[in-house]
Each structure stands twice: as structure tokens, then as C-alpha cells.
Amino acid sequence: MIADNKAIKKRIIELQAKLNIIFPQLYIDFLAKINDGDVYEVDDSGICLYSYSDLEERNQTYQIKDFEPNYFMIGQDGDLGYFINVGNPTDNSIYSNDLGALGSLEMEKESNNIFDFIGQNEK
């Protein structure tokens, strides 16, 4: 991770406007700390979290908005996707679901926020 980057935060705000969604603040803070274009791997877990520049393409590829309109995919581990709730931007929780079962299975809460999810205690 790198220090907060104002240029990246500006691009995140532009992405939110383009997609007409609002990310939870702690997730914005996380995105601003990782390098653009880098995939953030959670230790050696196989879980990869996308940088802001990959988010739109990944969500389009998996048609997330069609199947889970209140959620936005932020990463994955094989067929398991990780999501934030953009239907409630005050919800900082991280959720998961099988990418082949979107829309038919309930989202499963994995963590209270992105920093707990990656094993860091920051805000």
C-alpha cells in the first residue's frame, strides 16, 4: 500500500459519478492507498482486491448490476466474489457470494469493513 493519493481519490469520485453509485468511505480510503493498476492480494489467501481502475470492467464482465443491483464487486478468489453494498453507502461491510449464483443466494457478510477484511486495523 502507498500513502493517500489525492489524484487517485479524484478518479474514484469520478468513477462513482460515472457509475451513479457511492462507495463506503472506508473503501474509498483503501482504494486511495493502493497503486493504480495493482491487484491487492490479501496475504497468501488467494483473495485479490481490484484497484479502482479495474472495478468498472470486472463488474461489467460479471454483470453484477443485473443480478445484484445494490452490490458492487471489489475482488475475488476464483468463483467467489467480494462485494460492498452500494445500496447503503454507510454500510462499510464486505460481503461474498458465489459468482455463478448471483441473484439466487443471499450475500454473506465477511467483515465489518475493508481494513478488518485485509487484517489491518486502520481507518
Task: List the predicted regions and their residue ranges.
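A surface-exposed partner-binding patch
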Residues: M1-N88, E122
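Segments surrounding the PLD/"HKD" phosphodiesterase catalytic module and close analogs
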Residues: G81-K109
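Compact, glycine/acidic-enriched structural inserts
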Residues: L102-E122
